[in-house]
Amino acid sequence: MQRIVLGVDGSDGSIQAARVAGRLTADLGAELTAVHVRHVAPIALSAAPVAVASDPEETLGAIEELARKRTAQTLDPLNIPWRFQVRAGDPAAELEQAAAEQRADLIVVGSQGHTVVERLLLGSVSTRLTHHAQRPVMVVPLT
């Protein structure tokens, strides 16, 4: 296993996934890319973990920065090389596309990222990936 793609959104679930992916990366000497997907959905903005600004772009930027900061706080102490990539679109589709482009051997995601309402309306990224991805997917539970 040489390349791992990690889905991050700044949630506790994605940080738990980052811990597991980081340790796996260190143990295997693999390459790790943390991918944050900007997904514009009104319900997502209403449930954002940051103060919602009147400008959706500003809100998306704040969410992206939170994801970047929390991921760095988790991965940097492991002293592994990693990079952060931002994409826009459907999170499951974009994570699969990023993995395909990088010829990743594994996609790692947290089991929870959305609120209950968001999961009902948008579906679970981890569920969609496990059913449709063309490569192995590791879903890390929030403990």
Task: Identify what each model region corresponds to.
Residues 2-53, 78-80, 102:
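Small/aliphatic-rich secondary-structure junction motif
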Residues 66, 86-90, 112, 143:
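Short beta->alpha linker loops
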